[in-house]
Amino acid sequence: MSASNQKGSMQKTLSLWNFFTIGFGAIIGTGWVLMVGDWMIIGGGPVAAMIAFIIGAVFLLPIGAVFGELTAAIPISGGIVEYVDRTYGNTMSYITGWFLALGNAILCPWEAIAISTLVSDMFGDLFPILRSIKLYSIMGADVYLLPTVIALSFAVYVIIQNFRGASAAASLQAFLTKALLCGMILAMGISLVKGGPENIQPIFASVEGAASSTSASTMFAGIISVLVMTPFFYAGFDTIPQQAEEAAEGLDWNKFGRVISLALLASGGFYMVCIYSFGSIIPWTDFVKSSVPALACLKTINIFLYIAMLCIATIGPMGPMNSFYGATSRIMLAMGRKGQLPRSFAEVDPVSGTPKTANILLAVLTVIGPFLGKKMLVPLTNVSALAFIFACTMVSFSCYKMRLTEPDLPRPYKVPGGKFGISLACLAGSLIVLLMIVPGSPATLNAVEWSIVLGWLAIGLIIKTLHRNKTCLLYTSPSPRDS
């Protein structure tokens, strides 16, 4: 079935700024509010954490450039499925797309859990009525009615925006990105007035936090321990190419290729400022003693600043939820077009231009989130990280092979350094994947996380088997000049 025969078509409304806010907002989210204390604990101080995030950004830049080159050359929704299919065939394309769908889709219920956790744990201290009706406990975590309802209302709003179309979702993303930046500016201002560089001393120390402790014995080991976590906190730049088919007419594709790298660099700078600002407000060894230190330290300084930051932190998860919702639906759309998922996944709503079936499936997954409890955050985090990096690595190898098999393909943007730069992306991705699967590595998945991965793979193999005799749908990728 050709593109023209598809039911409906994607709206072409997204500008370079829209793409930047989609990626940047997906990357930063509010993980920094919940995790900045853990970064310092695991690294043995804010200095080690900052160095790790710098290295992490540099590590992922070649991968971001690979996405930029391929997306500018082949700007279609869920392009990862297309790239791998053209180089390594339908089976590997399916595996890559299926795992990336897992990695991205997980972030939707993850963010819903984060909202309910902040409402119950932090707002619950201010307004005990929020914890007055307990529904049940799961994995030792209590689930309360009112925080669940509030998280559901936030999630439903994001779902509605994505059903309305890419333009509405992009407008929401722009607002949320500005809100997150306001929160960071607030933290910076407080650190300048109340804190000082002497508070980041000692440069390295083993400390005990509310829920974790430093296991590294040296600063170098601390940097490595944080470094293996950074791919998850930089995950989100891939949401930019997933919606490339909805780029506005006349978009400069050379600049588009640079947007992904810019989003990574901006996020790296954001994390640097975040870690330094919170690490210097008060002595960092005191800062990390609270359960959510980024908020707890503000509560002792000024209750109004605390409430302001808490509000920003609570609406913040809507940003990555929005970005990953849109990205995952486009991945499933691409897989439907390839015949890798049921035909209904290839259908686009004629009015809103959004993938109908994928949106419905993601809506169900997202609203389940608040009912799972906060103890599911860590397993979902690690599974998402592995799925994301595996897909990025496959895209990097596809980019390299496409340079050999399709040398004449128009490439408005190219990876700096050519094949050498692409090789660096392949190496970086492979190394991170190995760190996550080799026994003994600080980032190795545990039994629960492996069960999620293997369960998802089993479901995927069943679907693949059911569809193995179906003819792949033909879809012609538009060139940049035709988009």
Language-model region placement:
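Helix-loop-helix junctions that connect adjacent transmembrane segments
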Residues: N5-M10, A49-M50, I129-L146, F175-I307
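TM-loop-TM module centered on a large, flexible mid-protein loop between adjacent transmembrane helices
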Residues: E82-D85, G89, D121-L130, V207-T214, ...
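C-terminal membrane-solvent junction of multi-pass transporters and transport-like membrane proteins
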Residues: S344-G353, C392-G440
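Transmembrane helix-boundary motif of multi-pass solute transporters/channels
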Residues: K12-T117, P231-F232, F237-I240, E245, ...
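Hydrophobic transmembrane alpha-helices that form the core helical bundles
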Residues: D38, L61-A155, T314-A334, V378-F390
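Transmembrane helix-loop boundary segments of multi-pass membrane transporters
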Residues: M40-G44, A48, A114-T117, F123-G124, ...
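Conserved small/polar residues in nucleotide/adenosyl-binding loops
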Residues: Y475-D482
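Membrane-interface loop-to-helix entry segments
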Residues: L146-P197, I260, L264, T381-M394, ...
